[in-house]
Amino acid sequence: MGHSDGDHGSDLSADDSPWSEGSWSDDDDEGSLSFEDSGEGSDAESDEPDAPAVEESDSSEDEVAPRNTIGDVPLEWYKNEEHIGYDITGSKIKKRDREGRIEAYLRNADDAKNWRKIYDEYNDEEVQITKEEAKIISRLLKGKTPHTNVDPYPDYVDWFEYDGKGHPLSSAPEPKRRFVPSRWEQKKVVKLVRAIRKGWIKFDKPKEEPNFYLLWGDETDTADNKRQGLSYIPAPKPNLPGHEESYNPSVEYIPTQEEIDSYQLMYEEDRPKFIPRKFDCLRSVPAYEKALREGFDRCLDLYLCPRTRKKRINIDPESLKPKLPSKKDLRPYPRTCYLEFKGHNGPVKSLSVEATGQWIASGSSDGTIRVWEVETGRCIKVWNVGGVVHRIAWNPSPDRHILAAVVDHDLLLLNAEVGDEDAQMKTKGLLQIEELAQEEDNGDKKPAVKWVKHEKFDGIMLIHHKAVSTVEWHFKGDYFTTVVPSGDSRAVLLHQLSKKHSHHPFRKLPGLPIAAVFHPSQKMFFVATKKFVQVYDLQKAQLVKKLESGVREISSISIHPGGDNVIVGSKDGKLCWFDTDLSTRPYKTLKNHSKDITNVTFHRKYPLFASSSEDCTAYVFHGMVYSDLNQNPLIVPLEILRGHSSSDGRGVLDCKFHPRQPWLFTAGADSVVRLYCD
C-alpha cells in the first residue's frame, strides 16, 4: 500500500519529530536564536488521525532573507574586492571594516561575552551564540550527542522470541555441497599445480641479506643502533679537591724540604701534582699557580678527546663461583685422624697397603721396613735392610704377599710373611732363584739387571747399573717396573717375576723419566718425564699420546681406576687433572699447596683422590668421573688434613688410600704414619 501526502505528513508530526519537545524563538535579551523547551509535546497530537500534519517553526531564521546576494559562488572571488555582492537595486554591498588587533583586545577586556561572538564570513557579520548553543558545541567537541535527552545506547529489544513457538525461523537441512569437495576448486588447484611445475608461475626468491660486519668497530657504534644519529654524551666532571689540599693540614702531612727535593728526581708522571702547605687563615692562601694550565688542559680534553659510553655490567661475584654440591652429600671421606703408627726413628718416605686392606707396609730412612696391622696399629714385622728405603710397593695380587722395596740403589723383593699357609708357600716359590740370572740385551756387554738371591731375608735382590727411584706393580701382580732417572736407554725397565726376566722397552726417551705406571685394565704404559706424560701401547710398541702438563717439574703420577683420567703432581705445588678423551692439556689445574707435592693417589672404589705435600698438609678431593662422555668430571675440594710436623723443611712424604674403605694413610717426616677416617 502507498502512503498519501497526508499520511506522509502524519509520520513527520510534532509527536515523532526529535524537535517536538522544543521550538525555535527569538531571544530578545541575547539578540540571537535559542532553543527553548515548550513542554507541550503530549498535546501536539491531532485528534483526527487522518488530518494532515503541518510543520510549523517559530524560528526567525526562516523569515530573514540572506543578506548576501552573491549566490553560491566561492568567497575567494571577492577576497581582494571592497564589496561583497550586490543589492536588489544593483548597488555594491560594501564590506564592513574589520577592527584591528588593538580594538579586538580592548573589546575582549571590556565585554565579558565577547568570546561567544563568531564572525559570519558569508553574511559579513558577527553572530553571538547563546549559552544553550555553547553547551551543544561543547558536547559535540566531546563526542557526545547534541541534546541530553537523546540516549545513544538504548536497551536492546529482542523482537523475536523462540520460546513458546512451534517452529524455528529456519529448519532447512544442510545442503549436500557442504559435505562434498568442490569440483571447481579442484580444477583451479590442478591448474595452479600444472603452472608451477611448468614454470609459468614463479615465486619471488627471498632477498639475501648481506652478512657483513664491522671488522674493527663495535656493534654499539653502528648507525642502526643509534637513535637519531650521534647522541650527546656529557663531559666528565672534574675531580673535587680532597683533604690533601687543605690550607691548614696536620704537621705529619706537610713534606719536609728533603722530600720536596726528592720529588725533582722523580718522573713527571710520578711526581705529586700538589704539595701541601700550611696557612694561618683562608684569606692568606695565594692563587693557584696551575689553575690556568689545568683549565687549558681540560679545554683540550673536552675539545679533542672523543667520548664513548661504556656499559657497566653489574655481576654478582657469587654467581661466578661454580655451583658445587654440599660436602655432606659427598660423604664418606677422610676427615679426622683415627690412628697413629709410631716406631720409625727417621722420616717415613713411602707407604703401601696390602690388597685386602688388612696390612700396611712402611719404609723409612732409618733403614727399616715395617708391616703394621691396620685395625690395631700393631707392628708385626720389621726388616733392617741397612739402607734408606726410598720406595715400597705391595704386590696387588691377594695371594702374593711380596714387598718390592727400593733400598739405596737397588730393588729388594721380600716375603711379607702374612696370610695363610697356601699363600705363604706360593710366595716362597716365586722368590726362589736357582742361579744368577743375567739378562743381556742385543749389543750390550753389561747386563741391565742382575737377579741375585738375598740369603739374609730369603728374597731376591735386583741389582741395577744405576740408582733406582721408583717401583710400580702391574695390576695382575706378575710384572713390575722400575725407573732409573739417569739410566739413558735403560731408564725404564720391565721385570717379570715368574720368569725372573728383565728388559728395557724404550731405546730413547724424550726426557729424564720421573715415574712410570701401568694402566689399571689395559696394555698401556704411562711414563712421566719432567714436563710431559707419554702414553705407550705395550702390545703395538708405539706412542699413543703425549700429555702436556705445563708445570715446572712433575713429581708423581696416578691413574684413575677407569683408565681415562690421570692426575699429576708437581714440585711447584700444582696438581693437574688430565682427561685423555678430552684433550692432551690439563682439564683442571689446582694450586693448593705452597710447597712441593710429594705424591698423588686415586681411590680404587670411591670417587676420591688426594695429594700430599711438604707443607705438612694433605688435601682430599671428590673426583667423580661420569660414564657419559658429554659430561665433564666433577672436582670438589673436601678436606685439608693436618697433624704432621715439619722436619728439616719436609712435611708429608707419601699418601695412600685404603683399597676398600674411605681411609687415607699419610707418611710424614716426623717418623709417624697417620690414618685418617670419616
UniProtKB/Swiss-Prot annotation:
Coiled-coil blocks: none
Xref: Pfam families: BOP1NT, WD40
GO biological process terms, semicolon-separated: maturation of 5.8S rRNA from tricistronic rRNA transcript (SSU-rRNA, 5.8S rRNA, LSU-rRNA); maturation of LSU-rRNA from tricistronic rRNA transcript (SSU-rRNA, 5.8S rRNA, LSU-rRNA)
Keywords: Nucleus, Repeat, Ribosome biogenesis, rRNA processing, WD repeat
Residue span of region Disordered: 1-73
InterPro entries (UniProt xref): BOP1/Erb1, BOP1_N_dom, WD40/YVTN_repeat-like_dom_sf, WD40_repeat_CS, WD40_repeat_dom_sf, WD40_rpt
Chief location bin: nucleus
First and last residues of every WD repeat: 343-384, 386-424, 463-505, 508-548, 549-588, 592-631, 647-678
Biased composition (Acidic residues): 24-63
Subcellular localization(s) per the UniProt record: Nucleus, Nucleolus; Nucleus, Nucleoplasm
Gene3D superfamilies: YVTN repeat-like/Quinoprotein amine dehydrogenase
Assigned GO CC terms: nucleoplasm; PeBoW complex; preribosome, large subunit precursor
Compositionally biased intervals (Basic and acidic residues): 1-10
GO MF entries: ribonucleoprotein complex binding
Function: Required for maturation of ribosomal RNAs and formation of the large ribosomal subunit.
Family label: Belongs to the WD repeat BOP1/ERB1 family.
Protein name as annotated: Ribosome biogenesis protein BOP1 homolog
Taxonomic classification: Eukaryota, Viridiplantae, Streptophyta, Embryophyta, Tracheophyta
